[in-house]
């Protein structure tokens, strides 16, 4: 248990903005927002929000990683900057569906989240390439 806590603190110190974004995603995912009638005219506003939220979070992860490393570790990046956010998104969607009465889990939300994460991968690779 002590090791896990130390590792968590180490990650939070090394990647503070990424950790803040991840915590913010969890909070926003379970906050009971009221319906916004003014946004009903925007097509797929919910999906665009998901893409922006996950793309932004993973963009921050990539930015912090690239700024602290001279070489890309493809395995770590695949796991921490692509797979783990998608698994987190899946977990959140399931928790929204089965553990709340005011939120619903949707497959299209998961697809939008995955799209945002994948866009961030492209951003991260371009950021690394042009950083040199």
Question: What positions do the PLM features span?
Answer:
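Bulky hydrophobic segments
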Residues: 1-108, 114-132
């Amino acid at each position: 248990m002590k090791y896990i806590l130390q590792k968590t603190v180490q990650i939070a110190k090394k990647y503070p903005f990424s950790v803040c974004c991840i915590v913010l995603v969890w909070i926003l995912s379970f906050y009971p927002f009221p319906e916004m009638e003014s946004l009903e005219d925007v097509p797929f506003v919910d999906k665009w929000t998901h893409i922006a939220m996950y793309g932004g979070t993973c963009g921050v992860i990539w930015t912090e990683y690239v700024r602290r490393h001279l070489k890309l570790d493809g395995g770590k990046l695949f796991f921490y900057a692509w797979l783990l956010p998608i698994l987190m998104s899946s977990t959140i969607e399931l928790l929204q569906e089965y553990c709340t009465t005011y939120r619903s889990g949707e497959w299209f939300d998961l697809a939008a989240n995955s799209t945002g994460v994948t866009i961030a991968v492209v951003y991260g690779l371009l950021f690394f390439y042009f950083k040199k």
